[in-house]
Amino acid sequence: MAAERALGNEPVDVSAQKIGYDIASHDPRSGHLRFIEVKGRIDGADSVMVTRQEIITSLHEPEKFMLAIVQIENGFAREPIYLQGALQTNEPTFDVTAIQFNLKSLLARAEAQREVTQ
């Protein structure tokens, strides 16, 4: 929430609603809305679990969906690393409740996106 406010956005915590993301963040300059799913990862973590609903939201709203990976180092949260868009190319089957993603792969995808936009 603080990182979104620092960007000049107006975030709202919607995590209790279980709608496929944790934060709805409005950019008052552009009028755009961002759907942000936050995943905190401790030192040494090698994966991130993403629920079926979060994946479906990323597929249905790829231009709005962002995965924010917040790494926890020595008990302190680092700045979020954002990965925008669909997390995979297809919807999980109904018997899949969550998928484990490799953390290094997600961070590499986020870095590649950042390089393209700079």
Model-derived segments and their meaning:
Residues 1-118:
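Mixed-charge (Asp/Glu-Lys/Arg
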